[in-house]
């Protein structure tokens, strides 16, 4: 009988302990709300643009902001994942729509044509970036604490933000194009610059890299360029597949390493003003 009572009490204690753990887990989940990813319509040059604002769950007034310039196919799952990740870290993030409402490319051919237009008309690209920066600030970001990042075509845009002299503290290019028209003069580059580049990226010829380095030196920029071995173009984009022979492919090691360099850059650029940054990518 005594054994039965002891066994019953043990089972009751185990059930009670499990219930307490479950209640604690539910409480923790409720106390850690997820950031919001909200569609935002803004305009530039009479064109409606449909971006996304990622708002931290516990948003602080005038938190640092990060503008995300997507790759040539426009806003995709990858850019949304990055925005959400940054919002979890406490940043206000905004994904720019460069092409505009009704102009989302359906094929790589269309994407190449649209991206090519903005590369050939950098002043128009810069205006679209400026409009997105304004939308980021309106979403709650500190106008004096902003970093612009971009992927592929967007990486080119991040450098254009630096060339335009926008009020941003830093720019980061993930596997982006580095060149500009030879007729454009090299000017002062005020923001910090970080270029994260695949060592085997055939889309960016050495001549373009040399020109970029000269531009940075002529502009007296505070710049860094990091090469990742075995990585080709689009190394952060899982949708690119894993076949390096195609010239664009995902590389998990380069993806994780580039994210670590990026978060270190944020810590340095924002001077530790905000959040405990996490270098581990989800």
Question: Which stretches of residues belong to each language-model region?
Answer:
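C-terminal catalytic histidine-bearing segment of alpha/beta-hydrolase fold enzymes
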Residues: 222-282
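Acidic catalytic loop of the alpha/beta-hydrolase fold
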Residues: 200-204, 233
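Short alpha-helix in the alpha/beta-hydrolase fold that links the catalytic acid
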Residues: 82, 205-216
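A conserved short beta-strand
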Residues: 167-177
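Gly/Ala-rich beta-loop-alpha elbow adjacent to hydrolase catalytic centers
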Residues: 150-154, 158
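Short beta-strand/loop motif that positions the catalytic acidic residue
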Residues: 195-197
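Serine-hydrolase catalytic machinery in alpha/beta-hydrolase-like enzymes
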Residues: 26-33, 38-139, 237-249
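Alpha/beta-hydrolase fold nucleophile elbow
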Residues: 140-151
